[in-house]
Amino acid sequence: GNAGQDGADGAPGGSYSYSGPGGYSYSGPDEVAGSGRLISRTIDLSGVTSVVAGAAFVVQLKTGGPAQATVTMDDNLADQIEASVTGHELRLGIKPGRSVRNATLRAEVTVGQLDQLAANGASKVTLGSPVTGSALRLDANGTGQITGPVAVDHLEASESGASVFALSGRANSMHLNSVGTSQLQGPDLTVLNLDAVLSGACQATVGVRDTLAATADGVSTLRYRGNPQITRQQTSGVSSIVQDST
């Protein structure tokens, strides 16, 4: 059982192809099946501060050195896979118009400083060490997942589709924008000042210490622990903003 083999819904033989910025769709008969014979290549990441993962890439990410990525894939997919650096950004995914199935797509990534991270398509990114710094931007869509610890001054987090942030650690301030059925699983994340906007059927759980400003629409739910001063609390539909007493 390899983590890279399932489609977004766990269906065998599912495949993703690129269809515009950040978008993936099931595709047709000209897809390439992974051979099962794995190859790896190393990419220099000097100066890279942004990582964008797509398709079904499984990424282990940490900060430190040396700044490089080791990308592992089936040996017959090298022409289908995008693993390249442009400016300060590493992009991992499938080339536009290409399609793969039963593929192993893995990357071990080390950057000196992380400012932006995106998990698109069905990618999964795990942070192996706390991300530090003044500001960190996280984006996730599709069924993308970002998991791990943060320790930053400001956290800007945006998620859509059925994506998941599973975060721990702390941030002095956080702005969260969630749509679709996305989730913020942050029972071990503490934010001093949170501004959250949720719509659709989103779920968010987070610790808030000083101030909370929140808007929830649709059937979304924000659960917070702590006793912050509430500066905005707007709900509509059957959405809710509730203090978690557990």
Residue ranges of each PLM-predicted region?
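Extended, compositionally simple hydrophobic/Ser/Thr-rich segments
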Residues: 40-43, 49-61, 89, 105-245
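Short acidic/polar N-terminal linker immediately downstream of export determinants
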Residues: 1-80, 89-110, 126-127, 239-246
